[in-house]
Amino acid sequence: MKAVKMKEIREMSREEKLRKLRELELELLKLRTLVRSGGAVENPGRINLIRKDIARLKMALCEEGYRV
């Protein structure tokens, strides 16, 4: 999966951004749990990509005046 671009994020509605944010946070939680339980992650760089996407979404929501 590729990174979500700011242009794409700004075109989303607030509900879409919040849904995507919850989706990514859940995926990050699952990956972190897998790593901590001793499992091997298929793509370790995916964790950093998800973290950056979450930050982009939160920044876009803050720009709209929505507190996350």
UniProtKB/Swiss-Prot annotation:
Pfam (any one): Ribosomal_L29
Taxonomic classification: Archaea, Methanobacteriati, Methanobacteriota, Archaeoglobi, Archaeoglobales
Record organism: Archaeoglobus fulgidus (strain ATCC 49558 / DSM 4304 / JCM 9628 / NBRC 100126 / VC-16)
Gene Ontology molecular function, alphabetical: structural constituent of ribosome
NCBIfam families on file: L29 (TIGR00012)
Stated family: Belongs to the universal ribosomal protein uL29 family.
A single GO BP: translation
Keyword terms: Ribonucleoprotein, Ribosomal protein
Protein name per Swiss-Prot or TrEMBL: Large ribosomal subunit protein uL29
GO annotation, cellular component aspect: ribonucleoprotein complex; ribosome
TM spans (from-to): none
